[in-house]
Every structure is written in structure tokens, then in C-alpha cells.
């Protein structure tokens, strides 16, 4: 009998987008797919750890809670990701994508299924920001249980406290996913205290194997 033992030093949790996904074509484009399962630094939305396996990104943090995402690529200024087209579930989340494309909101890392990153000329089809595209994909309802609950509490320095609570499940043809995220802290500088409340809800109904309604 032959016995094979294998192991790996680190989990490499960055992949590439498929050539064709749903109604989008990514063939020939510089793309990356960041898998969020079992990533470190998720409780603080720590961008340095979230993107630590993604090359050529310039990242800095202006707060210690991950309230805003500051990433840049190709030598561009990372301030509030103004040179990236930032989306959530393929929808713009910038305040004014054309006139003032700065991102004031970043979804909590615990709720993400994956992060799509497209750079180069291929990203221009999504907007005028030539740094690239960042798309946050929120988790979908779990298919294995009628009710799945996740509760996560985190304490940190500077009186930091974070609570993430999510509910997910599928009942016959009806699926749901919702979460609430609360953060508070004093910050590492004077006059930088904060409170953050995030709520998200997704409902899905399968009309058939190929047709479903969601909102």
C-alpha cells in the first residue's frame, strides 16, 4: 500500500476570477479573488491583513477599527480608496462615483464571502477610477440549515468593542441572510472616538432551479 502525507506551510487564500462568471467576462484581465474564510484580522477589519496576499497595493489606516478602507494601486493615492471603484454586491457604495468618489463605508469582514479585485484597463468598464475595481460579495443564505446564528464579540485597546451578529437559513424555497455590526472605541488619537452601526438584510425566493427573486 502507498501512503501519501501532504501539508502546507501557509494558506494561500487568493485566487483568480473565472474567465466567465454570470454575465461578466474576465478573460484576459488582471483579476484576483480574495477568499475570506479563515482569514486573520477580521474582527478589526484590518486592511493590512485582509489584503496581505494581494500584490502591489498601497494601504494605510487612519483609524483602528477599519471604518474606512484606504487602498491604492499602480502608485495612486490610497486615501479613502478614491482611485478605486468600490462596490458591494456589484452596486456602487461611493457617495458620488463621478464627482467625489471617496468611500466612507467598508462592510465588516465577517459578513464577506469574497472580494473581487480587477486592475488595469479592464476595470474601466465599471467607472472612471483607473486604479481598479473592488467588489465586496456578501454571504448568501446557508442551504444546510433553517437557522444558523453567528455571534462574535471582540475587545481591544483604546476601549474598542465590536459585536457582529448574523442569522442565515433556508426554509423550503425561501432563504435569508441578515447581520448587525456594532463598533465603538476611543481611537488612538484625541477626539477620534467613534460609534458605528451597520445593518444588512438579504431575502431570496427560488421560483425554479434557474429563476429566483431576491432583494
Language-model regions: role of each:
Residues 69, 130-132, 147-149, 161-165, ...:
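Hydrophobic, lipid-facing positions within transmembrane beta-strands of outer-membrane proteins
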Residues 8, 120, 137, 152-158, ...:
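Outer-membrane beta-barrel pore domains and translocons
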Residues 51, 114-117, 134-136:
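Non-catalytic regulatory/gating segments with a bias toward low-complexity or hydrophobic composition
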Amino acid at each position: 500500500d502507498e501512503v501519501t502525507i501532504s501539508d502546507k506551510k501557509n494558506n494561500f487564500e487568493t485566487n483568480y476570477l473565472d474567465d466567465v462568471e454570470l454575465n461578466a467576462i474576465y478573460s484576459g484581465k488582471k483579476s484576483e479573488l480574495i477568499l475570506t474564510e479563515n482569514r486573520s484580522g477580521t474582527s478589526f477589519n484590518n486592511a493590512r491583513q485582509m489584503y496581505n496576499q494581494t500584490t502591489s497595493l498601497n494601504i494605510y489606516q487612519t483609524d483602528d477599527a477599519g471604518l474606512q478602507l484606504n487602498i491604492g494601486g499602480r502608485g495612486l493615492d490610497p486615501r479613502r480608496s478614491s482611485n478605486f471603484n468600490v462596490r458591494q454586491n456589484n452596486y456602487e457604495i461611493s457617495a458620488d462615483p463621478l464627482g467625489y468618489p471617496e468611500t466612507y463605508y467598508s462592510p465588516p469582514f465577517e459578513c464577506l464571502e469574497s472580494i473581487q479585485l480587477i486592475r488595469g484597463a479592464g476595470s474601466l468598464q465599471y467607472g472612471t477610477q483607473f486604479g481598479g475595481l473592488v467588489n465586496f460579495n456578501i454571504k448568501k443564505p446557508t442551504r444546510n440549515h433553517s437557522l444558523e446564528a453567528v455571534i462574535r464579540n471582540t475587545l481591544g485597546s483604546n476601549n474598542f468593542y465590536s459585536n457582529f451578529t448574523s442569522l442565515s437559513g433556508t426554509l423550503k424555497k425561501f432563504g435569508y441572510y441578515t447581520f448587525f455590526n456594532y463598533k465603538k472605541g476611543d481611537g488612538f488619537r484625541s477626539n477620534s472616538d467613534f460609534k458605528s452601526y451597520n445593518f444588512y438584510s438579504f431575502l431570496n425566493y427560488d421560483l425554479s432551479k434557474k429563476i429566483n427573486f431576491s432583494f
